[in-house]
Amino acid sequence: MEHCDIAIVGAGMVGAATACLLAAQGLSVRVIETRLPESYDPAQPLDLRVSAISQASVALLEQAGAWQYLQQMRLCPYRRLETWELDGFATRFNAADLGLPQLGYIIENRLVQLALLKRMEDFPNIQTHTPAAVLSLRQSTDDVMLQLDDETTLSARWVLACDGAESHTRKLAGIGVSRFEYRQHCMLINIDTEFAQEDITWQQFTPSGPRAFLPLPGQHGSLVWYDSPARIRALAAMSNEALTAEVRRHFPARLGGFTVMAKGSFPLVRRHANDYHAGRVVLLGDAAHTINPLAGQGVNLGFKDVACWADLLHSAGTGWHKPELVTRYERRRRPDNLLMQSGMDLFYGAFSNEIGPLKLARNLALNMADKAGPLKEMALRYALGLV
């Protein structure tokens, strides 16, 4: 049997970031991953899966030592954010209002993962098992024993489940999850644009769902189209040429000239684990919670989990293995994750109907929010993870 301090299941963005931060504390780390991503080539088309990486997440990536590698690939800073339903009733945010150089960056998920995996190579105390998966786990008071499908038997003081929304580790640990399926699906559409993109991301609410635009490097962008499952299935079946015409009909004219290059779709599901731990198995990121992607906060919440767990272990010093740490972790992270989930659900519910008085009220609210001064700044700082 092999032994380590920390076993991390999943080498995605959350798992790889956790590995880097804990290895930097001198802990021995094993990372178990079924499949590594394709390596980066600047000639590759941009991936569909992107994230709006907040300033707090940038700071975490810098702390992990991965930001230097990301800067050698491709990313797109955004400095302004705008959201509206009716013309003239908009809320606008600007990095300059907070004295920041940008609100964050739009980055392909795979590139964030690759930068973190590259950083992992710098640590002699990180060992990766790939391709490998956990077949079983058995807990005792002081450790967890894992049986992997590469015939490795591994014991660890902590097992961190970072293996995503359908976490197999969570199931093996016997942790239940509450689940809610929204009445919408989401389509991601990568476009080539007529002109190089500016530093703004925007979102318009419509009766059938939001329409959003995220800038990507150069003359590229990402569109996000929320609609009924049947409508999204119909859009997914269209040729790129037909979809281009459909987007022109249903997105704001400010989008300008563009051509659809790639598309994909998925259902919208909110999940929240009933517990963030079972014994010495701890959930981080999507294994613990997923939210409506309206504000692009998914991975940022995951990185806040990572920062919290790393801080708890660091603060504990030689007591990093004590079982009471999991209670502190859940006490810190569950309320914040629940608040963000509830906030996204509030937006979803408020903007998903055509009741006249409510429509007027929500547009007035957007307009008032734009003029709210300190409250607006506080909300933005919270969304960016700066408070």
Predicted regions and their residues:
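Conserved N-terminal helical subregion
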Residues: 2, 59-62, 73-172, 180-185
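N-terminal Rossmann-like FAD-binding beta1-loop-alpha1 element of flavoenzymes
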Residues: 5-31
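Conserved Rossmann-like nucleotide-cofactor binding loop
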Residues: 14, 37, 166
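Glycine-rich FAD pyrophosphate-binding loop
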Residues: 23-46
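N-terminal glycine-rich dinucleotide-binding loop that anchors FAD/FMN and/or NAD(P) in oxidoreductases
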Residues: 47-71
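Conserved FAD-binding catalytic core of PHBH/FMO-like flavoproteins
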Residues: 61, 159-263
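FAD/FMN-dependent oxidoreductases across multiple families
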Residues: 231-321
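C-terminal helical "tail/cap" subdomain of flavin- and related membrane-associated enzymes
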Residues: 311-387
